């Protein structure tokens, strides 16, 4: 009888443990998103100008997707549709109002994770509506609703942020931050991580930096600083774009009106790389906080940018084009259960493919509204290719197709057709 009771007690204990196991088996997700970062603005990917030790460490630890693209945009504010695509797993023609609003019929990635037992948290930039933010996240802090910090209001140094509002109204929750934006977002993430690890639920922390997006005129007192004279200009630098692409008068291009000299671009790049290095330092703080929780080995880490940016390449200074520097984005995934470390794949993919990929990794259902493709087979090494080509669109004037090593771009500006063909291997 005593043996029977002992076995029964052990059985009940195992049953109790197995009852809470499905949630704890799901990996945590730390999603680090930056703003306007070129896909090659990383030392570990060959950029000799910039210092990015923390992002370099992530590249050494995970799988880097070197041919990742945002699908484009139908408006000048690329980050709005790009982030909406990322959150809905849908393409540029499939999001609503250029991403300004995410309707309830489009289940967001954090919303799906939340419905499957995740505690969801966000800090930083949300370039969509309040309602979709609150559907997605059960908690948040130092939240930035909008596109960029205004130059005339002290930019990143005095960001207008919000505390989390359970009502979703955000009418009396705003305040002016007293530290650099990236530090405030990292601080909020660190505070969340310190408590999330104690809960009996997996977490998804979305840390959405607004750097290195301009304003670049004021750098914080941390992070590496650069001398303009030491900056190596991109090999495809031009003083101005060779023809009218339909967007040469947009705000981004007027930050430093063309024609631009090499010396002017060196000054701009010194500031830009200063922003890249400062956000890299804050990413390091977040990673250190994750390590301190003991959850690193149970956490999938994603690093990406919403879109790229021209910094003198092809005579441009914005992102309103379909060149590699504007629509190509850095992206990597670290799954601690994987044996692939420091692996790079040149398989074609979209940024919004992250949505089904993370669902797949977490073992949860991919909503029917998602049209992206899971990259998990690439992570597992069961295939080296998922897409045959990439289609890109900007406004109603530019379209592009990438297939194999070639990119074709066509422009229609007031009826004038211009075509370009690039060998991307050269």
Q: Which positions does each model-derived feature cover?
A:
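Formylglycine-dependent sulfatase
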Residues: 2-3, 7-12, 20-419, 424
């Amino acid at each position: 009888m005593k043996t029977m009771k002992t076995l029964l007690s052990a059985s009940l204990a195992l049953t109790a443990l197995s009852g809470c196991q499905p949630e704890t088996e799901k990996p945590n997700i730390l999603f680090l998103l930056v703003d306007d970062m070129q896909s090659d603005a990383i030392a570990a990917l060959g950029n000799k100008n910039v210092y990015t030790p923390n992002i370099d460490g992530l590249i050494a630890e995970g799988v880097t997707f070197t041919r990742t693209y945002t699908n484009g945009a139908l408006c000048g504010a690329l980050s709005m549709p790009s982030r909406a695509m990322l959150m809905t797993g849908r393409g540029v023609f499939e999001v609503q109002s250029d991403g300004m609003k995410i309707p309830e019929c489009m289940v967001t990635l954090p919303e799906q994770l939340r419905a499957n037992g995740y505690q969801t948290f966000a800090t930083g930039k949300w370039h969509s509506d309040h309602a979709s933010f609150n559907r997605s996240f059960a908690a948040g802090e130092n939240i930035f609703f909008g596109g960029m910090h205004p130059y005339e209001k002290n930019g990143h140094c005095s960001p207008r942020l919000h505390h989390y509002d359970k009502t979703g109204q955000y009418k009396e929750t705003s305040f002016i931050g007293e530290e650099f934006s990236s530090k405030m977002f990292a601080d909020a993430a660190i505070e969340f991580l310190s408590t999330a690890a104690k809960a009996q639920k997996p977490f998804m922390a979305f840390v959405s930096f607004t750097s290195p997006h301009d304003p670049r005129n004021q750098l914080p007192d941390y992070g590496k600083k650069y001398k303009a004279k030491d900056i190596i200009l991109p090999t495809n630098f031009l003083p101005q774009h060779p023809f009218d692409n339909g967007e040469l008068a947009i705000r981004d291009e007027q930050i430093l009106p063309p024609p631009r000299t090499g010396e002017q671009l060196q000054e701009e790049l010194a500031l830009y790389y200063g922003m890249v290095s400062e956000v890299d330092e804050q990413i390091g703080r977040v990673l250190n906080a994750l390590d301190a929780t003991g959850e690193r080995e149970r956490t999938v880490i994603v690093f990406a940018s919403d879109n790229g940016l021209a910094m003198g390449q092809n005579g441009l200074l914005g992102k309103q084009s379909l060149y590699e520097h504007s629509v190509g984005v850095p992206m990597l995934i670290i799954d601690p259960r994987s044996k692939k470390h420091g692996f790079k794949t040149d398989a074609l993919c979209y940024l919004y493919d992250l949505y089904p990929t993370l669902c797949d990794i977490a073992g949860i259902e991919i909503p029917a509204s998602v049209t992206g493709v899971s990259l998990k087979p690439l992570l597992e090494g069961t295939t080296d290719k998922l897409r045959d080509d990439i289609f890109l669109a900007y406004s109603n004037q530019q379209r592009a197709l990438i297939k194999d090593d070639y990119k074709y771009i066509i422009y229609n500006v007031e009826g004038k057709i211009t075509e370009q063909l690039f060998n991307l291997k050269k």
